[in-house]
Amino acid sequence: MSFRKVVRQSKFRHVFGQPVKNDQCYEDIRVSRVTWDSTFCAVNPKFLAVIVEASGGGAFLVLPLSKTGRIDKAYPTVCGHTGPVLDIDWCPHNDEVIASGSEDCTVMVWQIPENGLTSPLTEPVVVLEGHTKRVGIIAWHPTARNVLLSAGCDNVVLIWNVGTAEELYRLDSLHPDLIYNVSWNHNGSLFCSACKDKSVRIIDPRRGTLVAEREKAHEGARPMRAIFLADGKVFTTGFSRMSERQLALWDPENLEEPMALQELDSSNGALLPFYDPDTSVVYVCGKGDSSIRYFEITEEPPYIHFLNTFTSKEPQRGMGSMPKRGLEVSKCEIARFYKLHERKCEPIVMTVPRKSDLFQDDLYPDTAGPEAALEAEEWVSGRDADPILISLREAYVPSKQRDLKISRRNVLSDSRPAMAPGSSHLGAPASTTTAADATPSGSLARAGEAGKLEEVMQELRALRALVKEQGDRICRLEEQLGRMENGDA
């Protein structure tokens, strides 16, 4: 067996995480202490939102991404709820609209000013009332404008048309116990849910029917999570009967057995999965952990491939994930997380090391853009549509530090080169020959440059030969290793 086949090839094997410098963090934020397994954080290309401690009700902070450093205690908040805020979610089709769910049993939708808050925001644009217990889950539809899902501790899932404040669908008989989380599929035709009864369900919200169900997806009693992947499979996190944390991958067509099941460790914190459909990488963050593990999902067994772990010193109380269109593609950034500490928010950048300054097509396929593919009425009528994709190539900015600059200015003359007679036709390259270039000194200068160039070329040829020699040697060693493993040597 060749060693090349033993080590799985992946362009994400060398992804590494890097926290930003202290002056790029958001300091002195009083992160909420409410007991709820939410991310407590939501981010988009314009704003960072964090659920914070508030007296006399619930509040969350909305900061422009550029508002780093220490945040003044008097900085205005969004503070219209009468009970603690449990979950927040930015609208995928409008970077200035955010929804929140609260212990006061309401869902509120807020319009954030273009440049951020200058005074406390107490009046939502829409109040959605329909739950009888606290609302802990908020999820916008991925492709239909103004469609919002909410789930409460009354075990009810409601689908809303935010534009009309109308309750579109009420699903009140599908969950016998507390709902831990919900996740829309790629086009928003279905959603999956994880429930306290240990079941994972796939639900058609417009029909109000159960499409598939897996009882005891994870046998442990602690909270679990379920998310849809782009190809329709379901990824879950949970606990075993012995309280070991687990990951699993399921095929909705056959939920009898998981396609893959992995055990991680014996920590207590719930595992929060963040999925990137463009790269098929799942990032798993444990509440109370100080690490982020990431895995690549493939179509071949064993399906879930561990890539690496980012580890820091401080435990995380929550986590937000930047949408792909908010990343710095010129730095080969494939993910950015916003880690909540006790009193600050720290961005963590995930990067694929690349030597080339060119746009990396393989890292950045077309991704979901901010334009809705459907109106709410179209979705209600039964239509489905995939997200409208955009290219990130326009966001690419070449690194100025690596630009090659060549100057041929003559050190013997500050005068501009004279144009040769008859050489001024449109579009022709301007001549850079000067009178000084024709002198013996100019000839020597050019000869010196040519000599240096030849030295560089010789060194480059030698390096290429060395690389080829090393490559051949590696191949020979791999063949020897393969023969030894097969018992031939």
From Swiss-Prot:
One of its GO terms (biological process) is ruffle organization. Residues 408-444 are annotated as: Disordered. Residues 449-474 form a coiled coil. GO terms for cellular component: actin filament; cell leading edge; cell periphery; cytoplasm; cytosol; extracellular exosome; focal adhesion; glutamatergic synapse. Keywords: Actin-binding, Coiled coil, Cytoplasm, Cytoskeleton, Phosphoprotein, Repeat, WD repeat. It comes from the Eukaryota. GO terms for molecular function: actin filament binding; Arp2/3 complex binding; cadherin binding; identical protein binding. Gene3D superfamilies: YVTN repeat-like/Quinoprotein amine dehydrogenase (2.130.10.10). The modification Phosphoserine is found at S2. It is found in: Cytoplasm, Cytoskeleton; Cytoplasm, Cytoskeleton, Stress fiber. Phosphorylation by PKC on Ser-2 regulates the interaction with the Arp2/3 complex and cell motility in fibroblasts. Phosphorylation does not seem to affect subcellular location. InterPro entries: Coronin, DUF1899, WD40/YVTN_repeat-like_dom_sf, WD40_repeat_CS, WD40_repeat_dom_sf, WD40_rpt. Residues 428-441 have a biased composition (Low complexity). Its main location: cytoplasm. WD repeats lie at residues 18-72, 73-122, 123-166, 167-210, 211-256, 257-296. Forms homooligomers, but does not form complexes with the other coronins. Interacts with Arp2/3 complex components, including ACTR2, ARPC1B and ARPC2. Binds actin. Belongs to the WD repeat coronin family. Regulates leading edge dynamics and cell motility in fibroblasts. May be involved in cytokinesis and signal transduction. This is Coronin-1B. It comes from Homo sapiens.
